[in-house]
Amino acid sequence: MQDPKVVIALDFDVKKDALDFVDRIDPSQCRLKVGKEMFTYFGPEFVRTLVAKEFDVFLDLKFHDIPNTVAKACIAAADLGVWMVNVHASGGEDMMIRAREGLAQFGQDKPHLIAVTVLTSMDKRQLSQIGIQSSPMEHVLTLASLTKQAGLDGVVCSAQEAAMLKETLGKEFMLVTPGIRPQGSDVGDQKRIMTPQEAMQVGVDYMVIGRPITQAKDPVAALDAINVSIA
C-alpha cells in the first residue's frame, strides 16, 4: 500500500503486549501512533524500535509550551525518525512557527508537523467552561486557520469538521482524525465519531483508530477489513 490511511493508536501499558501486537502488523498496511501514556512508560527507545521495524510513527505528544521549548521538543522527535509530530494550536502562531523552523534542518526527512485544534472529547458546554463561547466547529476553524497561517502541514480534527476545513483551507491542508469507529464498534470516550468510509468521503487524509483494531479478536483481519472498506 503506497500511502496507508489508517494510523493505529497503540494504547498498551505493557511493552511486551505492544511489541507482540506490532509484530503481527504489516508496516505497509498502516502507520502507528504513540501517545503520552506509552511514551511515558516506554520512552524514546520504544519509538526507535518501531521506526527500526519500518513503521511510520506519529508521535502524539501535543507539545504546548513556550516557543523555544516546543521547537526543541519537535527537533528531538525528528531525531527519533518519526513520520509525524503534533503541537497544540492554542499555543499560538509564534510557537507553531518556531516548531516549523526547528524542523527545517531535517530537509526532506523532516516529519509532518500538525496541530491539535479541539479535542474530540470536548463539546460546547466544556468549551464554555474554559472561557470559549464559540461552538466546537467555529473554534476548530479559528485554530486551523491559524495553523495554516503558521505554515504547518495540517491539523488534528474531528471528521465532522473535515469537509468545512478542506473547503476553507484547501485540499493540500492535511487532516488527521481520531474518533473513527468501524460500523458496530463501541464509541468509547469519543463524542464526535464517524466510520472510516464516511471519513474518507468528507476529506480526511489519515484516520486514527485504536481499540477496534488493537482489541479485536483478529487485529490483522480488522485492519484488512478497514483498508478494503476505504480502497
Curated annotation (Swiss-Prot):
Coiled-coil boundaries: none
Pfam families: OMPdecase
UniProt-annotated binding residues for substrate: 11, 33, 60-69, 120, 181, 190, 210-211
Cellular component aspect of the GO annotation: cytosol
GO biological process, alphabetically ordered: 'de novo' pyrimidine nucleobase biosynthetic process; 'de novo' UMP biosynthetic process
Active site per database record: K62 (proton donor)
SUPFAM superfamilies, sorted: Ribulose-phoshate binding barrel
Known pathway: Pyrimidine metabolism; UMP biosynthesis via de novo pathway; UMP from orotate: step 2/2
EC id: 4.1.1.23
Keywords for this protein: Decarboxylase, Lyase, Pyrimidine biosynthesis
Sample GO molecular function, one term: orotidine-5'-phosphate decarboxylase activity
InterPro entries: Aldolase_TIM (IPR013785), OMPdecase (IPR014732), OMPdecase_AS (IPR018089), OMPdecase_bac (IPR047596), OMPdeCOase_dom (IPR001754), RibuloseP-bd_barrel (IPR011060)
NCBIfam families, per the entry: PRK00230.1, pyrF
Function: Catalyzes the decarboxylation of orotidine 5'-monophosphate (OMP) to uridine 5'-monophosphate (UMP).
Subunit comment: Homodimer.
Family named by the database record: Belongs to the OMP decarboxylase family. Type 1 subfamily.
Protein name as annotated: Orotidine 5'-phosphate decarboxylase
Species for this entry: Pseudoalteromonas atlantica (strain T6c / ATCC BAA-1087)
